């Protein structure tokens, strides 16, 4: 820690003058004469040792009390200063540092060609907090509101499915946090128990790894409950270009052995490393599910910016999953409010269990909670809405459905009558 602070302090004065006066934000990646080393086909042990040195310096910075106390501008200065020091030591590729002020990220490339980054802000929980609400008790309560159909049908469906066993499998890939003192996790734990009792055998993976996300095809329904963002980086050895891609953030920490294990995906930029943790891109899914390995699966993502942002919608994630055989993919444009997203998931899956197809189930959720999260936000008395409304979009077949027992559909029809 002392060495890290010393390096920051020593480099900060010298570097930040250079940063603020000589180089515009995007120029770090486009200095003439500076090119990234060509990517190798595999990672060597030497490559991984170098990356681990870089990761150790980055995580020492981002995990420090001093960094936690900084505002975003101060974090940017500290991150750039640290990366310039690492560049001088040969642990970051010259010319690869890129500032993305809009997405609060500094990206860079390791000498071996793997992509990395430093967040300037912690992933945000888009909540309706007490200070923004007329009524602070607007959180979805346990048990959540079941709606008329589910309330009426619950006992008969539960009885039927207890006799016949589960009709399908679902996994919630939960990587919002480590679940300790979590304000989110209890809701997902409740959903797991409720859906399992209704016949959809549901598991929660609270230690999601890159390897786990290659097994989503084992489920009828896979739910991605993780943070997400945009990652901006530069590519090209002689003619550099800036690219931006949506990414899914995991809590899985980078290690020497895992870097070797994931080397092929790291070099292919299907996995990147941010703040010493693994993140995945759309190409990860496209590569993992070649040959239709995701067939007959519905994917529901709660990830922020999974489908891009207003004015720059990005269907790369959805296309990658559909190319792997997924029947349908649901995701959000823009950053989505936590409670709205969770409520939409709850209502949508409940109506899938009742036998509705994904198109009808999603429309029911929108009718219940609002077409977008600002409709929901204002209905709850919110006073400080975020800049852009987040809304769910369905890709693939709107007719995709779970293979539920006839009793589920019969109960739903009886309730609706």
Regions found by a protein language model. Give the residues of each.
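Hydrophobic core
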Residues: 13-21
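Sec-dependent signal peptide cleavage junction
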Residues: 21-36
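Structural alpha-beta junctions
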Residues: 89, 192-204, 321-332
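Cysteine protease catalytic core and zymogen-processing segment of caspase-like enzymes
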Residues: 231-327
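Active-site-proximal C-terminal subdomain of hydrolase catalytic domains
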Residues: 298-416
């Amino acid at each position: 820690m002392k060495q890290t602070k010393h390096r920051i302090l020593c480099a900060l004065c010298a570097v930040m003058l250079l940063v603020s006066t000589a180089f515009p934000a995007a120029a770090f990646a486009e200095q003439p004469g500076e090119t990234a080393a060509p990517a190798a086909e595999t990672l060597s042990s030497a490559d991984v040792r170098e990356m681990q040195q870089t990761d150790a310096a980055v995580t020492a910075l981002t995990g420090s009390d001093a960094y936690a106390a900084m505002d975003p501008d101060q974090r940017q200065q500290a991150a750039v200063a640290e990366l310039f020091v690492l560049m001088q030591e040969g642990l970051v590729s010259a010319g690869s540092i890129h500032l993305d002020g809009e997405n609060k990220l500094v990206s860079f490339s390791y000498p071996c060609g793997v992509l990395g980054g430093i967040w300037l802000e912690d992933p945000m929980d888009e909540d309706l907090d007490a200070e923004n609400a007329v009524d602070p008790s607007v959180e979805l309560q346990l048990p959540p509101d079941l709606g008329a159909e589910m309330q009426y049908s619950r006992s008969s469906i539960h009885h039927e499915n207890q006799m016949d066993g589960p009709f399908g499998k679902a996994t919630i890939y939960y990587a919002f946090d480590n679940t300790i003192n979590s304000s989110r996790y209890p809701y997902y734990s409740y959903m797991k128990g409720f859906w399992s009792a209704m016949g959809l055998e549901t598991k929660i993976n609270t230690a999601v790894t890159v390897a786990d996300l290659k097994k989503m095809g084992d489920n009828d329904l896979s739910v991605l409950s993780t943070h997400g963002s945009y990652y901006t980086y530069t590519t090209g050895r002689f003619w550099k270009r800036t690219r931006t891609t949506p990414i899914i953030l995991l809590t899985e920490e980078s290690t020497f052995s895992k870097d070797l294990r994931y080397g092929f995906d790291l070099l292919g930029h299907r996995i990147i490393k941010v703040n010493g943790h693994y993140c995945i891109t759309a190409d990860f899914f496209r590569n993992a599910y070649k040959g239709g390995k995701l067939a007959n699966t519905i994917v529901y993502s709660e990830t922020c910016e999974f489908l891009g942002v207003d004015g720059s919608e990005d269907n790369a994630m959805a296309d990658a999953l559909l190319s792997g055989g997924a029947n349908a993919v649901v995701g959000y444009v823009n950053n989505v409010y936590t409670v709205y997203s969770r409520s939409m998931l709850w209502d949508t899956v409940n109506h899938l269990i009742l036998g509705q197809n994904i198109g009808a189930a999603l429309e029911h959720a929108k009718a219940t909670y609002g077409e977008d999260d600002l409709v929901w936000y204002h209905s709850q008395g919110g006073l400080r809405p975020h800049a852009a409304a987040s809304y769910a979009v369905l890709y693939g077949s709107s007719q995709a459905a779970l293979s539920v027992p006839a009793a589920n559909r019969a109960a739903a029809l009886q309730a609706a009558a």
